[in-house]
Amino acid sequence: MQDTASGIDIIENRTYDEIAVGDSAMLVRTLRPEDIRMFATMAGEVNPAHVDPEYARSAQFREIAAHGMWGSAMIANLLGTQFPGPGTVMLSQNLRFAGEVRIGDTIAATVTCRRKSDHGRHVLFDCVCVNQDGTRVIDGQAEVAAAAF
């Protein structure tokens, strides 16, 4: 929805009652060098495998790789801005980092409602991130408290 007076897109949520088991949402992003620099700066995580091309070539990655938590942040972004959206409180994330994400990779993060619990409006999501080749690079679960309204 757009606020016609300001031209700003308004983010809307899906409340706990509007979420059904099996519902899902997806966010797609392509990793850029500036994403890695911004994430390293924001997190203070300046491991040379993520920021120094020479070091990365000599290390296990062979080239600069994204911070694993970049994918985790994509999932948090998806849950907090799209599904369920504003009012969502992250309770936990349990993720497995199954593959590397490199500059130029396009990652599709998908969250799917696995279970709802009326107590506290808790929702458990299955989370999967795949690259442009369909290779799973992250999987796991996230639990949130969804908004009541």
Question: Which functions belong to the PLM regions below?
Answer:
Residues T81-D105:
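Mid-chain, well-packed structural core segment of small domains
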Residues Q2-T88:
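Hot-dog-fold acyl-thioester-processing enzymes
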Residues P48, P84, E100, A146-A147:
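Proline-rich low-complexity regions
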Residues M1-V21, V101-F149:
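HotDog/MaoC-like acyl-thioester-processing domains
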Residues M26-L31, R96, E143-A145:
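Generic structural detector for well-ordered beta-strands
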